[in-house]
Amino acid sequence: MKRVLTALAATLPFAANAADAISGAVERQPTNWQAIVMFLIFVVFTLGITYWASKRVRSRSDYYTAGGNITGFQNGLAIAGDYMSAASFLGISALVFTSGYDGLIYSLGFLVGWPIILFLIAERLRNLGRYTFADVASYRLKQGPIRILSACGSLVVVALYLIAQMVGAGKLIELLFGLNYHIAVVLVGVLMMMYVLFGGMLATTWVQIIKAVLLLFGASFMAFMVMKHVGFSFNNLFTEAMAVHPKGSAIMSPGGLVNDPISALSLGLGLMFGTAGLPHILMRFFTVSDAREARKSVFYATGFMGYFYILTFIIGFGAIMLVGANPEYKDAAGALIGGNNMAAVHLANAVGGNLFLGFISAVAFATILAVVAGLTLAGASAVSHDLYANVFRKGATEREELRVSKITVLVLGVIAIILGVLFENQNIAFMVGLAFAIAASCNFPIILLSMYWSKLTTRGAMMGGWLGLVTAVVLMVLGPTIWVQILGHEKAIFPYEYPALFSISVAFIGIWFFSATDNSAEGNREREQFRAQFIRSQTGYGVEQGRAH
């Protein structure tokens, strides 16, 4: 089961190769000057965009949502840039490299949550909200309690992701660039703060768009060169891969990674519903002018991501053929230099030489920056908009709210750097699974039921949401990953790797039970207000658009 965890941690889309994704002792590579030069070009260009964006950020709306003036196509690219991480690129191609067909199952598994967002969430979310998903959840429920719960759910997810990203960034850069781990972590943290602090959502959006274009171009070129090598025949690709892989034809069969159906189902539900509860993804739907553009955003994003995950499958099989069979990329013991997660990087060298290797290495670093910038902005908005402006200091001016948001960015950045350094040698793979479980168990049920269930009340949302969050955390702690591997106990109290199946069930049952038994006057008033909310969610009547958004 440890092998399962290692493989899954490598594929979780925001882990950015944290923890087991780069397993064992990290072999520091020689300083890659091509990669460093290309990355510096990217940094200078994106800092120029940040300067340009800073001149256009004049209001709260500009800072949180780029004024609502991002088009559906641009937002689709940015969402793809936010979601496709270094772990998607290196981790899934490594999974295909080691296990073959199973890698395709996992890569496509990440797309399962997007139809839910497209058909159930995107349109209503945009029509009901302004800056954060808490705007939607609290539309007819009590502002204070719901915003506190939503902000806590968001901040926990953001914190877990940021730690995983920072550790992953340090390890990855140590591998690819030959830079010191601590320097890498500080560099990522400082750049992240600069993008968000000065450029807000506009700069973050364009960093994500540029990163998505670079990643799609790099992956497309690699897949093209692999297919060119086999005469553009998938039959030749698979035949040659089977001929050189140690497992032979077994790499074309599914089921080699997950033997426990409960864990597989729990992981699948966590990924599917967790995607629809990630605060930095949901926040992107408020950057477009209306619900139509929000739908288009998901349509384009799903297309870009689907294309990308197909490319990773080709890249993985190409690595089996061109890297796995080439002793040049092996160490004295016969293992891949730098570990299996370097398969795609070695393939870049095999198909494009040292210059293209530098390009792919720089893109991997840019990928991490784009993801952490989105996470930081989501965390800052949860504090400044949900907690400060709507709970603790009602009636705060836009200027005060923006000041709190920027202070939060600095605090989050410093904390992320410190924790990134402290967790250098820790197994933090569980944090990614826990982040998905919390997003699926706390954020998603409240968002979905607040929009679709007329009988939902504040009491039900609060009890069910907190129960889901606490259950996810407790079961994760009592499970094999933390209880046995980290805390050193002999046997896990909770036998499964991932808690989502159980914590999601607890959340939905809790919300239903405590809402159904709520006979208070406040509860009845909230039920009566559902019709007005439903009309607004369907028609967008009263929603602020464009620059007035």
From Swiss-Prot:
Keywords: Cell inner membrane, Cell membrane, Ion transport, Membrane, Sodium, Sodium transport, Symport, Transmembrane, Transmembrane helix, Transport
Gene3D superfamilies the UniProt entry points to: Sodium/glucose cotransporter (1.20.1730.10)
Keyword check for Membrane: yes
GO cellular component: plasma membrane
InterPro entries: Cation/Ac_symporter_ActP (IPR014083), Na/Glc_symporter_sf (IPR038377), Na/solute_symporter (IPR001734), Na/solute_symporter_CS (IPR018212), Sodium:Solute_Symporter (IPR050277)
Residue ranges crossing the lipid bilayer per the database entry: 33-53, 77-97, 103-123, 148-168, 183-203, 206-226, 262-282, 303-323, 355-375, 404-424, 428-448, 464-484, 493-513
Membrane topology annotation: Multi-pass membrane protein
A single BP term in Gene Ontology: sodium ion transport
Entry's Gene Ontology molecular function annotations: acetate transmembrane transporter activity; glycolate transmembrane transporter activity; symporter activity
The UniProt record lists the keyword NADP: no
Cellular compartment(s): Cell inner membrane
Superkingdom in the source lineage: Bacteria
Main location: membrane
Cited function: Transports acetate.
Family membership: Belongs to the sodium:solute symporter (SSF) (TC 2.A.21) family.
Protein name: Cation/acetate symporter ActP
Organism: Citrobacter koseri (strain ATCC BAA-895 / CDC 4225-83 / SGSC4696)
